[in-house]
Design a protein with these regions (language model features):
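Conserved alpha/beta core of the MobA/IspD/sugar-nucleotide pyrophosphorylase nucleotidyltransferase superfamily
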Residues: 43-116
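Conserved core of the sugar-phosphate nucleotidyltransferase
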Residues: 1-66
Length: 116
């Protein structure tokens, strides 16, 4: 899944960007995943939400790590580099996630404020 990329996220290397051309239903296939971009065109904020068919999952786990996967620290590249298709849908909003200590602080504050 993807959502719109905010301007403040363009240079943030903790935010994975997905290169996708979406159709009129806001669906498409990922072409690439990167951490650094120069332009927002066809790039979206990647949301690490996956579903697999049993056959695809078995194929994926039996593939060796690729250079791009290791170099970029992005497991999605194993699939892309091995010509597996990753279908993408665009969501209206980015659900909260915890990938960094800063994210954890934001989530804790969110829960604290909602429980007051």
């Amino acid at each position: 899944a993807v959502c719109n990329l905010e301007n403040s996220e363009i240079r943030d290397t903790n935010i994975v960007k997905a290169n996708v051309i979406l159709d009129e239903k806001n669906e498409g296939f990922a072409k690439d995943f990167v951490r650094v971009i120069k332009s927002k065109k066809n790039f979206y904020h990647h949301i690490g939400l996956y579903t697999y068919t049993p056959i695809s999952l078995e194929k994926y786990v039996n593939l060796k790590q690729t250079f791009n996967e290791i170099n970029r620290s992005l497991e999605q590249m194993r699939a892309i580099d091995n010509k597996m298709k990753i279908k993408v849908v665009k969501l209206k909003n980015n659900p909260p996630s915890v990938d960094t200590m800063e994210d954890l602080k934001k989530i804790r504050l969110l829960f604290k404020n909602n429980n007051s």
